[in-house]
């Protein structure tokens, strides 16, 4: 009986500690600047998407329905992020970071690249319920990130599909130490896809080479 009581007391202490660490990230958003091609009539534009919560007008879709043409100057940039943290009375949110990576759709988890980190800056706070809410945002600092860096395009006939993956984390201090709160879609993270073209086909390269030879012959004749 004494042993059972000890176990119950220990369990209640654990439960109390868990309740005391209820602080969380309750909103997270990302800004993406898209220019599918510099030769089309559509200019580059930045859209902010909700990853979690309701900070922006649009939620991140499963697909951006976008094909970026790098041969025509197309680009895809991470250009900002926003977030909100809620902290219990004894806790204090120290930071908020957005983590991101890009990989070819279908790549096994073990083969995917490591995450990059995008630091959000503290902006302001309020306490409507007696507990502090903090707002975090970054645009000009740390600046933009080229999400296409190192990616290999597909061809015009067969574009390659890539997946963008995001999650957020915040370090929370409390009297007994610190812990990290995550916003990661229940462990699945937040994802969307896009397509990337073109890597010139062999036929295109051959045509380009023949055009160059013909131009060279014309110059020699002149």
PLM region spans:
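A generic structural signal for short, solvent-exposed coil/turn residues
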Residues: 12-14, 92, 197, 208
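Sec-dependent, cleavable N-terminal signal peptides
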Residues: 1-23, 204, 211, 222
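A short, hydrophobic C-terminal helix/tail in secreted or cell-surface proteins
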Residues: 199-217
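Mature extracellular "passenger" or substrate-interacting domains of secreted, surface-exposed proteins
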Residues: 20-196
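Generic N-terminal leader/processing signal
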Residues: 1, 15, 186, 197, ...
């Amino acid at each position: 009986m004494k042993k059972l009581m000890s176990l119950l007391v220990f369990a209640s202490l654990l439960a109390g500690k868990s309740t005391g660490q209820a602080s969380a990230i309750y909103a997270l958003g990302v800004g993406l600047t898209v220019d599918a091609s510099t030769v089309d009539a559509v200019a580059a534009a930045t859209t902010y998407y909700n990853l979690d919560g309701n900070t922006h007008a649009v939620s991140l879709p499963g697909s951006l329905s976008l094909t970026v043409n790098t041969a025509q100057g197309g680009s895809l940039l991470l250009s900002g992020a926003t977030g909100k943290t809620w902290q219990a009375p004894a806790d204090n949110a120290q930071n908020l970071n957005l983590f991101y990576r890009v990989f070819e759709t279908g790549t096994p988890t073990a083969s995917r690249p490591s995450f990059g980190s995008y630091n959000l800056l503290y902006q302001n706070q309020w306490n409507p319920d007696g507990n502090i809410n903090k707002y975090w945002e970054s645009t000009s600092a740390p600046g933009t990130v080229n999400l296409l860096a190192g990616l290999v395009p597909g061809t015009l006939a067969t574009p390659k599909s890539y997946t963008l993956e995001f999650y957020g984390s915040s370090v929370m201090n409390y009297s007994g130490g610190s812990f990290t709160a995550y916003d990661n879609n229940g462990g699945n993270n937040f994802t969307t896809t896009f397509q990337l073209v073109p890597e010139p086909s062999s036929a295109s390269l051959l045509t380009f080479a023949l055009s160059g030879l013909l131009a060279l012959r014309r110059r020699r004749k002149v």
